[in-house]
Amino acid sequence: MKRLLNIMRLPQGSDPRLARAHTIWLAISLTAMGCCIGGLGLFYAATAYTKLNSMAILYSYLTHPVILALNLLPAVALIWLGYFLFRRTWAGFLLSFLPIVGISMVNYFKIRLRSDPLLATDLRLAAEAGGIVGGYTLDITWLTWFTVFCFVAGLLFTIFLMPSGLRDWKNRAFGTLSCLALMGVAFYSWYLSPTLYQNTANNRFINQWSDVEVFVSKGCVYPFLYSFQEMFPTPPEGYNEGNAQTLLSAFADQDIPAEKKVSVMGIMLEAFCDLTDLPVLGEHEAVVRAYEPWHQLEEQSVTGNLLTNIFAGGTVDSEWGFLTGYTTHDDFRKPTDSYVWYFRSQGYQTMFSHPGYGWFYNRQNVNEYLGFEEQWFTDNHYEALVSPLSAIYNSDHILVTELANQLEDQVENGPCFSFAVSYQNHGPYETTFTSAVEHLTPTNSGLSQESCNIWNNYLNGVADTMDAMVWLTEELEAMEEPVVLVLFGDHKPWGGNGNSGYRELGVTFDLSTTEGFYDYYSTPYLIWANSAAKEVLGNDFVGDGGDFSHAFLMTELFNQCGWEGPAFMQLSRQMREITPMVHGQDLYLVDGAVTDTLEPEDSNFLQAFLGAQYYRENKVVPGA
């Protein structure tokens, strides 16, 4: 036993013959320790999404050696890097354990709470993380305590049984540079490779149409590192700047006729959806009654479904798609061409409003890049009216009152484009009690009390939202100024950890079917006009507007108004005729069915459209 301890610790004065055995022990134990850390990360990944069988997912990792290696390699490389840098194995353990397990835990809770994996782009929102998760309940499970045990045990093991380190600085420098070189080459050659990512498909136990399930099927560290490619502008496949410029220049911006200039107000409603679209609730009298104001408003409007890229979070994807027409885009860090800039070029005043902080999603900067001249946030307007915390529960009446007053004040100076993002009904929703009306009870619905509380609290919030929107239409109708109003939901609401509330409703979210896709991604929209606008535009603004991606909503608005619009919008009309949905998962809508395949000619046009879109986003200087 003493000889074994001497091999592990190699105290000064030990038999020189033990040095080689100690080196072998150190190499094996450090590598094994790194593999254990990586393995703990994989266990977090496998158990993150409650919809999946965690044991089956773990088994799939073991049967896919490339996925296994790509998830273990960073932990092993980091533990060796720390050892060479600091000459202590415990330092290597910390350098490996903290980032690898930290990323895995954040991903675990993010999926548990929002069905949304951790991506590299989320790092830009690190300062906002507290605001995002503040209302959620983090369940401290046995896995959390097991992680604490592993951390303490691993640290003690490396301190007392692996204390020795290299004293020769040349060997340490060589080892450090070797680790860095390995990590750099692996990152650029393996972790950012789309080809390798596709070739590591692990679809046996998942639905390949689900982003979160595909992410989980590849572990955590590997898909997280792969997502770094999304942090940098990447042109679409086959992109040629000259061809993109030529395609876009085939169209010219068309002015809005002076006699047809009407003010436009858009409001994106937080987590708004029509629960009566779900079969179980569509037959429930109390739920149908709650949505009567919305259904009556729909009868007076052009209506349809917005097919979003997101679920229960990621609000700005729908928001910015509407404002820009981009089906996909990079983060906005400079003035970027958008429909807001077009309105400005037509003499419109452009105004943005949100009863929350301007730093959230960096809206205060992004909105300026997209062309808004005036912005109202908590910081500069709403703080005196409602706190951001209270705004989650009760702010829509305040919002629409401010919007109506602002419009009345500003229209004297010319037509307005006003866009607002609501905050009321932001999830999660209280699970332990119902705050007001009990639309659903375990007796009349067959749901658990927790699910009843979730849906009741959501319904009470949206009922107030609908009341506010009806009030707004009445105010706009009374105005002499012609106004067109666009209302739409950004994404489906949170429905319990692991989507428990949806599961009890029998909603499977089977994304391989069109019905399941709609259940997961669709939200309603409507385009309403006051009498003055109907007269000016010669349109009654009633009927079916169709179902389409968020990027085509502004196009439909222009169609209803009889406006040609900017050059890019004219191109987008052609794209919409081929497929009204260009989804973030490379899915399309053809003849009313979701598909991942287009005819060759249509696919070629899609690539040309994406190229023109990329050119517009990155090369066109708005206002020039």
Segments (PLM) and residue ranges:
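Transmembrane and membrane-interface helices of multi-pass
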Residues: 2-211
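Serine-centered coil/turn micro-motif
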Residues: 4-7, 203, 219, 337-338, ...
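Hydrophobic N-terminal alpha-helices or hydrophobic patches in metabolic proteins across all domains
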Residues: 44-52, 58, 62-66, 70-72, ...
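Membrane-interface micro-motifs in multi-pass membrane enzymes
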Residues: 114, 120-123, 136, 209-221, ...
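Short alpha-helical interface patches
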Residues: 114, 122-134, 143-146, 222-233, ...
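Alpha-helix initiation and N-capping motif
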Residues: 123-126, 218-225, 244, 291, ...
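Membrane-interface segments at or immediately adjacent to transmembrane helices
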Residues: 189-266
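Solvent-exposed soluble domains appended to multi-pass membrane proteins
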Residues: 249-259, 266-269, 274-624
